[in-house]
């Protein structure tokens, strides 16, 4: 497999350098991300490891989603319903953390966490180890993005809250719906 060379940096590198991004930058990135993930989902692919390290940003602001290494086809149920936990613990949805299968809404959760990180420069859940973070993903409410930055509109916080709902049924049905909000 060959991938095009992309001049730029990862979103993680950008966040480390700058901390939080401006609201307009974060929204632009999220609009591109939801478009890209919509294309993946429309092709019956769940990424399962969305995080800033897997999103490259070119100098012109265009993003590229990378590392589909643990992605899985939606019709490949034996791969999405194993007892192995896939993905990075800081972005893993509660259902995956508890060993259940991945769905489109698993990627929605990760995008909500990513949006939070873009706007605050930090992760919503921290811990001393992966298990502690996974337990917080499963049980703790996501901290208010507006408490960290009161200039963020309530409508944007509502997008994050809906995307990161603990129950997948309460999240956006797909990336297209998240993009529309």
Please report, for each region that a protein language model flagged, where it lies by residue.
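Conserved short submotifs of the Hanks-type protein kinase catalytic core
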Residues: 1-10, 14
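Conserved activation segment of eukaryotic-like protein kinases, specifically the C-terminal portion
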Residues: 82-92
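Pre-DFG segment of protein kinase catalytic domains
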Residues: 64-67
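C-terminal lobe helix-coil module of Hanks-type protein kinase domains
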Residues: 90-181
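Activation segment signature within eukaryotic-like protein kinase domains
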Residues: 29-30
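Activation-loop N-terminal segment of eukaryotic-like protein kinases
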Residues: 57-61
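Protein kinase catalytic-loop region centered on the HRD/HxD motif
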Residues: 33-45
